[in-house]
Structures are given as C-alpha cells and as structure tokens.
Amino acid sequence: MRSALLATLAFAAAASPASFAIGPAGIVGPPPTPLTIVVVRHAEKASDTARDPELSDAGHARARALAAALRDEPLVAAWSSDFRRTRQTAEPAAQAHGLDVRTYDAALPAEEFARQLRRANDSGFVLVVGHSNTVPGIVAALCGCEVDPIDESVYGGRYDVRFDADGRATLTVSHFPA
C-alpha cells in the first residue's frame, strides 16, 4: 500500500510543475521556503535638521516600491532600527503581509544581530532596514563576504542573502527604484 502511495506521489510530482516534500508519516506538501534576508538602507529622509527625520516624499515612494517588490514573497518578519526613517521604510512591506515591524538596536555588533536573525528565522523572507553605516556590516556578517560601503547619497540598494538547506549563504545585490 505504501509503495503504491509513493509511486502515485512520484508520478504526481513528475507531472506537476510544483514541488513536493514528504515529511513525517508521509505528509506531503510544498518544500520549505529557503531563508532569504533582504537588507536595505532606509529610503530618502527629509532634509530637515531633526535628529530623527521622517522620510521625504521620495522616500515614501521608495518604501512603497520596496513593498511592491516584496508583495509576492513569503515575508515572515520585518526589522528596523529605532528611527522614524527606518520604521517608515519597513512599514509598507510589513503591513502588506500583516506583520508588525520589530525593532533592533543599531548599536548592536553586526555579527550578534546576524546570529539573532538566523536563530529567529529558518525559512521565508525577512526584511531588515538599516543605515548606510550599518547595512554593509549586517550583510557581511550574514553572508561571510566583503560588502562595499554605502555612500551617504545612495538609496535603493537591496542585498538579498539567501541560505540554502545546508546553511550556505549566497548574496545578490540589486537596486529597487522609487
């Protein structure tokens, strides 16, 4: 009986474009989504002199563009430092997935924060919004690779660190427009 079930499942999997995984007790379902941590710098900030400025109109547009780029991804968590500009960058994507934005301490060593992210998440997409002086360190700690500094005038860089089933990291760098 079990071999007939397995043969049927093998045929269904081969005939279908979708992937399947066999879990404990023969439970069948889609394979787990690998973990991808998307790290971005906050969007454009207002040019006022406040210590904790909000996003500018262009920044709000970029935050909405980021949310649109992540719309079809299985976003499971969103993190930002405790500044308005980072929260406002993360909020549209988080809200689109029914998530609250979690706060992390930007002064925390990047390696420690990277370990926290890996311990807290094992699959899906995780969004992290940081600053020009913190994003390269976070990405480097996650991927174990060198990451160039971010110029203070540059916005829209996206760093996707994808972990395979064996925990190996692959970094993809792209740009999301406003």
For each feature predicted by the language model, list its residue ranges.
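Active-site-proximal alpha-helix that buttresses catalytic centers in soluble enzyme cores
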Residues: 22-123, 135-137, 143-178
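Bacterial N-terminal signal peptides
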Residues: 7-16
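Positively charged n-region of N-terminal signal peptides that target proteins for export
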Residues: 1-4
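Conserved beta-strand position immediately N-terminal to the Walker
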Residues: 126
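Short beta-strand segments
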Residues: 129-131
